[in-house]
Every structure is written in structure tokens, then in C-alpha cells.
């Protein structure tokens, strides 16, 4: 699909462990979309937010994790990780957020 895009010169596909790739990048971003291993969401967030300009956005997918994060007792490592991520973002004074309850949950996070 990159080859079909009129922006193909601006696109670059990076594959591998994002916890190793992100620190090696020199760019800053206006929009970031996270849909990756749930256990590492907090790591990604902590690496990305400092490199984002004020007013930029981070979108985190699957933040309801099949509704499991709404249960009284969290089961499974992914549900626990997403619940921890949601609490982590909510407590971060650097950002504002809203959780959209579409499909499996999408959190829209804006850096102040």
C-alpha cells in the first residue's frame, strides 16, 4: 500500500521491537497510534510522550480489552496491563484523555 500512496516518499516501515526502535529514532510526532503488545503499552507511552509536541495526539487501541478491564476482578496479564495503562494515562498531568467506547475502546490522548 505504501507504493500506491502519493505520500510514499514520506513513509517508512520499521519492523521489530518498538522498545528498541523508538529510542533510536530522531523524529518527533504529531500523531502516534499504538496497537501492539498490551504489556508494553506503558513503556511505549513513556517513550513517546516526551518526544511529542504540545497539542499532538496519541491514540491507544484496545483500551477496553474485550470489556475485561471493566470487571471487578481482572483476569489475564493483558487485561491487567491495559487497566494499568489506563490508570497511568489518567494520572499523567502532561496529558488529557478521553476514552471512546467504540468497538474495543480507543483512548485519545492529547499532550498539553
Which sequence ranges carry the predicted segments?
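S-adenosylmethionine/decaboxylated-SAM
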Residues: 1-112
Amino acid at each position: 500500500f505504501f507504493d500506491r500512496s502519493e505520500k510514499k516518499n514520506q513513509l517508512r516501515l520499521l519492523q521489530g521491537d518498538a522498545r528498541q526502535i523508538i529510542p533510536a529514532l530522531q523524529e518527533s510526532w504529531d500523531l502516534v497510534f499504538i496497537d501492539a503488545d498490551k504489556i508494553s503499552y506503558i513503556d511505549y507511552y513513556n517513550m513517546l510522550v516526551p518526544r511529542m509536541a504540545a497539542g499532538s495526539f496519541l491514540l491507544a487501541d484496545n483500551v477496553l480489552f474485550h470489556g475485561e478491564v471493566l470487571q471487578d476482578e481482572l483476569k489475564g496479564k493483558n487485561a491487567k496491563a491495559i487497566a494499568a495503562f489506563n490508570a497511568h494515562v489518567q494520572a499523567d498531568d502532561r496529558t488529557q484523555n478521553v476514552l471512546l467506547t467504540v468497538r474495543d475502546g480507543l483512548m485519545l490522548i492529547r499532550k498539553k
